[in-house]
Amino acid sequence: MTASVGGTGRLSRARRPGALAAVLAVAAVAATACGGSPGTPGPPSAYLGTVVDRPVPAGIADLPLTTDAGQPTSLGAWRGQVVVLADFLTLCQETCPLTTGNLLMMDRAVSAAGLGRRVRFAELTVDPGRDTPSRLHAYRKLIGAPANWLLLTAPPAVVERIWRYFGVWYQRVGEDRPPAADWLTGRALTYDVDHADALLYLDASGRLRFVVMGAPNASGAPVAPALRRFLDAKGLANLNHPDASTWTAADGLSPIAWLTKRQIRTVTSG
């Protein structure tokens, strides 16, 4: 069974939608038609996610993050660009590789539309204890991420503060038995991280404007062979038999089109 709205990275576990629901209850606005010229993309469907209009305060935007190259950055450093931010961990076996595959397809479409400098894709770990910059860099090479793709970590307290602000829950849990082997080191895993599957869209002024919660439909997405082999039974089911309520790369592009006021066509992988 795959997750839909409020879904988790480990789909066998209980969903925890309450935190994000509280955020959206405060921030949600009606998804009305765009008042621009004909052909200008309007807000995405309410079926996909929730339109919001919420500032990200300096206390969150300026928290220090570190890229896979070991360079300092922050959410505020990307102001001036539309930011697509996802939570993930490099050792996720069920949904994160699929989210990454969809984001790669979205990145290609954005670049083909001439919007590469206006849109930034970023993934911030929910497993800072293991996801060091060097490990994130290995993940970058594994998935073939473009140079402008942001893979981020931070001290645990910073990661927790950022995701708590956005209403994205996660928690460390025991590893299944028998334990899976780390795709990078080959060593047996000793724990896992349950987490929500969140896709957050920030506009060029740094305001949170749209939220998608749920597992991805990565049919046709470029999932790295090593990560495909790393998927567990639930992950393979998510990849090969996605639930009807999951989001596709084309779905993920609609908030970007709305925020950039540009039509964007999906570019197939390969």
Indicate residue ranges for each PLM-predicted region.
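Short, small/polar residue-rich loop motifs at catalytic or cofactor-binding pockets
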Residues: A58-I60, V82, D194-A196
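Structural microenvironment flanking redox-active thiols in thiol-disulfide oxidoreductases
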Residues: T100-I162
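Short active-site neighborhood of thiol/selenol oxidoreductases, capturing the structured segment around
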Residues: L75-L103
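Sec/Tat-exported extracytoplasmic proteins
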Residues: V82, F88-L89, D107-G114, I143-A147, ...
